[in-house]
């Protein structure tokens, strides 16, 4: 695993499906993250971001109340969270969706279904790039 990653950081997993949150949580634990918090939609994720020190956000695109793209836009416009790494994990694999997420400032993008190895690699890519 990448030496650029501090596994003590708190990771926020935002997805409206509890099963998907559990899958992502289990993969994150396999990778080495133990400090994981969950949110069922973008609004709940914003509350977590307001109250907790988060080091990485893993978010779905399609969620009620506030989708992952709207969450990403709010993260990028708040000076407190503007530089926070965000990984979008979603079924939205159409080129225009990927482009919209990139334009909004996503750090990396994973299309469902995915493997633990793909999620790990995408996270490693984020932190390698951030390390320069």
Give the ranges of each region predicted by the language model:
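Helix N-cap/capping motif at the beta->alpha junctions
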Residues: 38-47, 68
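Active-site beta3 strand of CheY-like receiver
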Residues: 52-58
